[in-house]
């Protein structure tokens, strides 16, 4: 049985004070919550501090990016082994903001996926379509192409112990969200697409929804059979709002 995972992507937000206060708030809010995995991905500069603040809790540490290179003359980059060394477990790759602003290709993201698997880390592979692609009816084709970059190079087995986050780009930070039925349809397509190569692996892949999840829509989203939690942006910067989403996932999947 799949256990849901709710992960907070802090993006380019934070300070030493915020790290301390937000994690203290999360530990308090989530102390009695069971049945849902929880992770946070602060900016890289705060990973060590966050790891210390998370000690003894059930909240896992994540990161927002990784480089394809293992070491060497690559100024400004962070390697998979460095992330592992500092205590990170879940690593976000393929986020639409990196695909857009840093021109990261499907093939480049697949390389990151492989580097993370080799290091024993868990990729959180973000896929999803833009508003124009959505309106053109290309949602499934775009998601398939982004998945195939990994499937065709690393095989379906690479998706063992992996997270996929479906993030309709048109719903990120816009306040828009896919309806639960719309999101479920895409999540089922993603699972079925992986299942074409390996049904057993597809069944255990955690597929998160990542399009403006908030306290108001979380419960209804999580009742869908193929939505296994969420990758949360803005709401992850407030302990109470994030906790509501985690609790909704735990409650929805408990049955």
Curated annotation (Swiss-Prot):
Quote the record's binding site residues for substrate.
9-11, 173, 212, 233-234
Describe the reaction catalysed, as an equation. Answer: D-glyceraldehyde 3-phosphate = dihydroxyacetone phosphate
Please provide, in alphabetical order, the Gene Ontology terms of the cellular component aspect for this entry.
cytosol
List UniProt keywords, sorted A-Z. Answer: Cytoplasm, Gluconeogenesis, Glycolysis, Isomerase
Gene Ontology biological process terms in this record: gluconeogenesis; glyceraldehyde-3-phosphate biosynthetic process; glycerol catabolic process; glycolytic process
The keyword Magnesium is assigned to this record:
no
Q: One Pfam family for this entry, by name? A: TIM
Where in or outside the cell it occurs: the entry states: Cytoplasm
Subunit details: Homodimer.
Which family does the record claim for this protein? Belongs to the triosephosphate isomerase family.
**This chain belongs to which protein, by name?**
Triosephosphate isomerase
User: Which species?
Assistant: Pectobacterium atrosepticum (strain SCRI 1043 / ATCC BAA-672)
